[in-house]
């Protein structure tokens, strides 16, 4: 199966040297970093926001740092991120935040997709008002909203960056269960989890794990 995400000889000073990673549709990789700044920098590099010192980041065999602005924008439409910051727009209601990518790219939110979003929120244990501004949400509710927004955009690549680290245990398990359920679908995206330190995710069984706290990274493959 062709690679959807590929990191070739990727070097980011202070984080990793000569990292090689390849993810195909439906596969899951886990990267452990030594700190929050390392996680953020790796995320920015993977999604094309910050060039590495050397090496390449490819999505669908296209090197992100050789693309022009329009080409990069087109590639990013197939990538969804769920981060510790959640990325919700403060002056948009929760539901508007969740549906914004669909409206922006397609101009419509199909009824079936809206129903899927509401069901996901319920499964995650969301108790907030979807018509309130995100400033009223708890941290866990902000992450839930960000996850649902990512899922309903039907990405080909999901990147989870530190979004699970500070969640209360039950919320973490709920979100991880839904992330795993997504990976069990026939059209599952590739998924990259980036976490900090020794956070344990017992429900997650990645195809490959990279511990970037070591140089060279410790690599564990699922057998």
Which residues are covered by each model-predicted region?
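ABC-type ATPase nucleotide-binding domains, specifically the catalytic core motifs of the NBD
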Residues: 99-112, 123
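Q-loop/switch helix immediately C-terminal to the Walker
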Residues: 85, 91-104, 116
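Conserved ABC ATPase "signature" region
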Residues: 112-129
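Conserved ABC transporter NBD signature motif
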Residues: 55-65, 161
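ABC ATPase NBD coupling module
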Residues: 64-80
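Hydrophobic anchor residue at the start of the ABC signature
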Residues: 147
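Helix-to-loop junction immediately C-terminal to a conserved catalytic motif
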Residues: 47
């Amino acid at each position: 199966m062709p690679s959807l995400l590929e990191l070739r000889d990727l070097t980011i000073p202070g984080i990793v040297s000569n990292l090689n990673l390849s993810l195909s549709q439906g596969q899951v990789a886990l990267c452990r970093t030594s700190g929050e700044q390392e996680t953020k920098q790796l995320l920015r590099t993977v999604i094309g926001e910050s060039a590495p010192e050397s090496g390449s980041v490819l999505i669908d065999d296209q090197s992100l740092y050789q693309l022009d602005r329009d080409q990069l924008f087109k590639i990013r439409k197939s990538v969804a991120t769920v981060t510790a910051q959640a990325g919700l727009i403060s002056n948009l209601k929760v539901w508007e935040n969740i549906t914004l990518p669909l409206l922006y790219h397609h101009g419509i939110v199909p009824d079936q997709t809206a129903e899927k979003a509401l069901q996901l929120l319920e499964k995650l244990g969301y108790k907030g008002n979807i018509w309130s501004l995100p400033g009223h949400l708890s941290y866990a509710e902000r992450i839930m909203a960000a996850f649902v927004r990512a899922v309903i955009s039907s990405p080909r690549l999901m990147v989870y960056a530190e979004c699970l680290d500070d969640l209360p245990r039950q919320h973490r398990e709920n979100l991880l269960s839904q992330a795993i359920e997504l990976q069990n679908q026939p059209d599952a995206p590739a998924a990259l989890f980036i976490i900090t330190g020794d956070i344990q995710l017992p429900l997650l069984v990645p195809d490959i794990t990279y511990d970037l706290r070591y140089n060279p990274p410790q690599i564990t493959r699922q057998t």
